[in-house]
Amino acid sequence: MGAGISSIFKAPIGGTIFAAEILYKRDFEVEVIFPALIASAIGYVIFGFVAGFTPIFGYYNGTFNPMELPLYAVLGFVDGLMAILYVKTFYSVHDAFKRWRVSNYIKPVVGGAATGLIGLLTPEVLGAGCGWLNLAEFNRLNAFMSPITTLPPLIILATLPFLKIIATSFSIGSGGSGGVFAPGIVIGGS
């Protein structure tokens, strides 16, 4: 598991930590770290030789300023709250669709329609989402403008995590196929 994450996201240390914590609800398996590190490193190197070692989101070229550390602590706290919101929203929508007494063929249609409406207003919500994260990283927020909304790019960027949470919850919680891991990465990145 750690090797796959480290290869796909080109983050061997992240894959190691992911493998050590993902199987446990409130724990961290220390005995798994060394084997996961070896698997993650080997997976990363093999994938790197095939696909290249360039990071997905580029390199950070700025300077380190210790005065910014409290801002990163606040960002971590906000991301933690967003993770809780993501889980609560997803399960609330999923449970609501389970309780809904209509055909199981209708539920994904309704979820897909709701996701489509959100995507119509903000197309950046659909898909993997890494494209607009890259644009934000390189300070090119003007490059994504919704054809319908005329909101400033910064407002769109601030609302995207919430809209991504709602769209993911409707599309998968209604019975559609897909996963919650990759959207969670994008939500956390935004």
What are the functions of these language-model segments?
Residues 1-190:
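Alpha-helical transmembrane segments and immediately membrane-proximal extracytoplasmic
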